[in-house]
Every structure is written in C-alpha cells, then in structure tokens.
Amino acid sequence: SCKKLPNANEIAWYAEKGDARWDGERIWTTMGHLYKGGMWFKNKAFIKLTESFSESYGPGFYGDMRDNWGMISKSVAQGAPVGFFAERYFFLPALGSYSVGYLYKIGEEGCYWSSSAGNNNSNCGYMLEFNKNTVSVNTTGSDVGYYVMEFE
C-alpha cells in the first residue's frame, strides 16, 4: 500500500528544497548483492527550518500538485552531506525500476512512488525519480514497477 508514503506535494518539497545530493560511493544491499549509488535529501524537519514545507501544497508556484499537474526537474549536487548538518539528511538508494519483467538501472536511478494518484488519470501516480544528474517529480502509469518505501 502507498498510504504511508509522502504525497505529491511532499516529494516536490524534497526535490525542490531538499538539497538533493548524489552519492556514488554509498554502499547498500538488495537481493543478496552489494550496490553503490543513491540520493541524499534534507529531512522534512530540516527543510521546515527555512521553508514553509506543507503536505497541502507544493513549493513556490506549484500549489497543490494533486490538483494542478506539475513537473519538477532539477540538477543535483554531488557527494554525501558532511559536517554538523549531515545527520539531518536521509538516503534513498538507486534501486532502479521494473518494466515488462526486467529490472533496469539499479545503482544508477531511483524511482519511488508517492501516495498521490495523477490528477487526471487514476491509472497514473506521482513519483520521485533521480539519477546522478537530476531529481524530478512527475506522473507515470501504474504499470511500471517503482519502489514503495517510506522516506524518513
């Protein structure tokens, strides 16, 4: 179930104001294998120190993304967070995605569902997607295999 996942507005805040940082050296494991690569994001409480983070509306001019379709695509910084504030970030591994029975781009790309359906099509959902260069929020069809994971 996607009920406990962040909604479209929340993933927009992470993408837009979460200081997304690609870490190509962080090691993680899945399905009995070691992999590297993933994204660090500021946690919700840390974003709230400087921004008006809300579950009801997205950052800037986006409004409620569940009602007003919006796409975000943003360049990311490189390297893990360091120093005093590093503990205020969380890590999402680049778990790849499934499509037509195959696993794609594990260690290169992360694709995570939100709890929000697309505003014009209940067969679509909002998702957070990232790679070493960009982080994006968009909608896609529910026939692809993205990950269902609470963020923090």
Where are these regions (language model features)?
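An acidic, glycine-rich, mixed-charge low-complexity segment common to nucleic-acid enzymes
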Residues: 2-4, 16
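C-terminal, surface-exposed recognition/capping segments
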Residues: 10, 14-152
